[in-house]
Amino acid sequence: MLSSNYSTRKVCHLCEAVKYGAGPPFDDFGAGACHRNTSRDHNSYMLGFATPPPLSLIPGFQLCMLVCDPMHCLHLGVLQWAVGNALVLLSGEGRWGVFEGQRKHKLDKSLRVAYSEFQPWCRCRAISTSQPVFTANSVNRGESPNYFPEFKGKASNTRWVTMWLCDVLYHIGPRTEAALFWGLCEMLHIMHVFPGPWLTGRVAQRFARACRVALLSYGCLARAAKADCLPLWGVKPKHHQLDHLGEVVARTHLHPGYAWAFCDEDFNGRICKVAAACMHPHVFSLRVLEKYSLKVWLSLEDARTDSVNPPWKT
């Protein structure tokens, strides 16, 4: 099932975008992209299945309940591809020195120099990370130079590496990669600094604009690499999903990270910390789950009353 889903032409539950063949291309991020005219509603979504998926059989299920997980879409998706490509590209340009030897050996040495710059950048800003030293393996170039780069790291570590690379590219000068990382860092800034669950209209438009700048820049780099037959800047379905996230934020003013607390890793981690403080740490207490759910609900209610009104109340 996973293999068939991975190789399917259609990549989106919100529109008719496809990877290849007839249909709106999923890697078009322009304002006039064809897939923007093929939005699905709940009924058209359900008609696309020969056998309804189990999730859709839950009473009250609606398509709008399928929300974008910002951690897996942005931090563990788009950011990691952008960071991996930028590290490989800057190393190839000699940004961190020119070394002799095999390609992997040269990349390893260059990335170690890059890591030696990343560490003091973090210390100067009182940032604590658990990111190990950069190597060819950490950008998916350890086994073959023909693999598309992808940074391997935790979500929080990837965030800080992205912001460091934004500084590096800013000091190098104007280039498409700098525009890409500006857009990514602007989205990160809004997600981690502005309170939720609702954004003001101005901030929501800022997020949508940064998302559009980042995706258009990435698409431009991807087309240039494809024209030169280079294994760089591969476009994935998560880029398309991020495009939809920018539209949703602009339309609803809903904070892009409002579902963050319900991500599975975050949820499990919090539950384990709470359960460890209980009298019976090896027993998963329903009461613990209820208390955590109540705490999350109360925090969302406080944020809602302290921020702007929801769009339907304005």
Pin down the residues of each PLM region.
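Charged (Asp/Glu and Lys/Arg) segments that form or flank catalytic channels of large polymer-
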Residues: M1-I172
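Terminal interaction-prone segments of large eukaryotic proteins
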Residues: G142-S144, P149, G153, N157, ...
